[in-house]
Amino acid sequence: MYAVLTAIIAYLIGCINNAYILTKYTRKIDIRNYGSGNAGATNVLRVLGYKAAAPVFALDVLKGVIAVLIGKYLMGNTGAMIAGIAVVCGHNWPVFLKFRGGKGIATSVGVVMTVSPLLGLIALAIGVTVIVLTKYVSLGSITGSVTFVLLNAIFWNSTQIFIFSLILASLAIFQHRSNIKRLLAGTESKLGQKTEIK
């Protein structure tokens, strides 16, 4: 019963799409109609720039943190992991936006930094390094997600947290499947390439 309640609460928190809300009420646009069509911080960055993207990223991280803390309060570490997966699913497929959301990376950052701070920080650092070196946000996001899985395999804690990391990485890779195709084709947009709003 608590597992279901935890998942529902976390999913609904994830459904609060900050990219959509902030751009809708500050710029009067639906961010999903611009750039990549993704309702997330990276697309806000691409379309509107750093000043618009920063609060979106921060709030997306925050909702991951809040969901995990609620899950931990209700069910301990198991609840934290259930909530972590559910909040990312809510961000990716929000019921209030006809299941058209973001890719879950900023929210995943909040999740892993709360569930496993040390390994999460290492994975984040590696992901950010890849972004800085290549200018590909998608590549850095995927690398960071996979790194978190590898770190959990190397510094084994429990089967539960390894499966948790595997599910999060699978969600990230699935949401970036079109980016992966563009990376392989050499047509992926780099950080700094901006789509102007008319």
UniProtKB/Swiss-Prot annotation:
<keyword id="KW-0812">Transmembrane</keyword>
<feature type="transmembrane region" description="Helical">
    <location>
        <begin position="2"/>
        <end position="22"/>
    </location>
</feature>
<keyword id="KW-0594">Phospholipid biosynthesis</keyword>
<comment type="subunit">
    <text>Probably interacts with PlsX.</text>
</comment>
<comment type="function">
    <text>Catalyzes the transfer of an acyl group from acyl-phosphate (acyl-PO(4)) to glycerol-3-phosphate (G3P) to form lysophosphatidic acid (LPA). This enzyme utilizes acyl-phosphate as fatty acyl donor, but not acyl-CoA or acyl-ACP.</text>
</comment>
<dbReference type="GO" id="GO:0043772">
    <property type="term" value="F:acyl-phosphate glycerol-3-phosphate acyltransferase activity"/>
</dbReference>
<dbReference type="GO" id="GO:0008654">
    <property type="term" value="P:phospholipid biosynthetic process"/>
</dbReference>
<keyword id="KW-1208">Phospholipid metabolism</keyword>
<comment type="pathway">
    <text>Lipid metabolism; phospholipid metabolism.</text>
</comment>
<dbReference type="Pfam" id="PF02660">
    <property type="entry name" value="G3P_acyltransf"/>
</dbReference>
<dbReference type="GO" id="GO:0005886">
    <property type="term" value="C:plasma membrane"/>
</dbReference>
<feature type="transmembrane region" description="Helical">
    <location>
        <begin position="48"/>
        <end position="70"/>
    </location>
</feature>
<keyword id="KW-0808">Transferase</keyword>
<feature type="transmembrane region" description="Helical">
    <location>
        <begin position="75"/>
        <end position="97"/>
    </location>
</feature>
<keyword id="KW-0443">Lipid metabolism</keyword>
<keyword id="KW-0472">Membrane</keyword>
<feature type="transmembrane region" description="Helical">
    <location>
        <begin position="111"/>
        <end position="131"/>
    </location>
</feature>
<dbReference type="InterPro" id="IPR003811">
    <property type="entry name" value="G3P_acylTferase_PlsY"/>
</dbReference>
<keyword id="KW-1133">Transmembrane helix</keyword>
<comment type="similarity">
    <text>Belongs to the PlsY family.</text>
</comment>
<keyword id="KW-0444">Lipid biosynthesis</keyword>
<feature type="transmembrane region" description="Helical">
    <location>
        <begin position="154"/>
        <end position="174"/>
    </location>
</feature>
<keyword id="KW-1003">Cell membrane</keyword>
<protein>
    <recommendedName>
        <fullName>Glycerol-3-phosphate acyltransferase</fullName>
        <ecNumber>2.3.1.275</ecNumber>
    </recommendedName>
</protein>
